[in-house]
Amino acid sequence: MFDPETPPELTVSRWVNSREPLTLERLRGRVVVLLAFQMLCPGCMEHAIPQAKRLRARFNPAEVAIIGLHSVFEHHRVMTPEALEVFVSEFKLPFPVAIDEADGNAMPRTMAAYQMQGTPTLLIFDRAGRLRRHYFGQPDDIMLAAEIMALAIEETASPRDAAAVIERKLAAALNSEQHDHGQHHHHDHEHGDDCGCGHDHHHDHHHQHHAEPRGT
């Protein structure tokens, strides 16, 4: 069973636009924003990649790490590692990009481990390495930046109840009506005091690519 408190390490075949391989373990102490995308996904090109570039420009990389994950579950012959290198250079992606490792099934390993539904998917980890957000689709810029900043305020060893207080204050400050009509599917992995794992689901039907279940 997937546990956001101890999420699995990334399983990748290589890195592009990075001097050395990265791991979630090595990135602990920073907030990590991971964008899973495909080169031929319209939603990735129109929204997710430009958004990730804006986040990289606005946040201090010593505090917030932006990384990409090329998770190919379709058109494998076209979206090769060599094509990705050209893509990263041509579109001037300012962050490292990992290639999700294939395992013979349609869905690559990291994508399957995190139960992603397709691309674009955005995963946000706190300073302690816990998965705190899982977005499928197109989260709003302001909402996303506010959530990243809230996580950046937390200390690495921040108690869970202290983190929950910040989460509640953030939720109260955001316009919930606007939030509920956003173009995304959101899993909130914050564990509150009064429940298990809360899931606030918003379904996006605009431009994202859905992955087929493994083995199909």
Give, region by region, the residue ranges found by the protein language model:
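Structural microenvironment flanking redox-active thiols in thiol-disulfide oxidoreductases
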Residues: 46-91, 102-108
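N-terminal "domain-start" segment that seeds a small globular fold
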Residues: 1-25, 95
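Short, solvent-exposed cationic patches
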Residues: 149-175
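Structural recognition of the beta-strand scaffold that forms the well-ordered cores
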Residues: 35, 65-68, 96-99
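Histidine-centered metal-binding segments
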Residues: 170-216
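Thiol/disulfide oxidoreductase modules built on the thioredoxin-like
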Residues: 91-93, 101-147
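Short active-site neighborhood of thiol/selenol oxidoreductases, capturing the structured segment around
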Residues: 22-48, 52, 66
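Active-site acidic short loop of glycosyltransferases
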Residues: 28-30, 61, 93
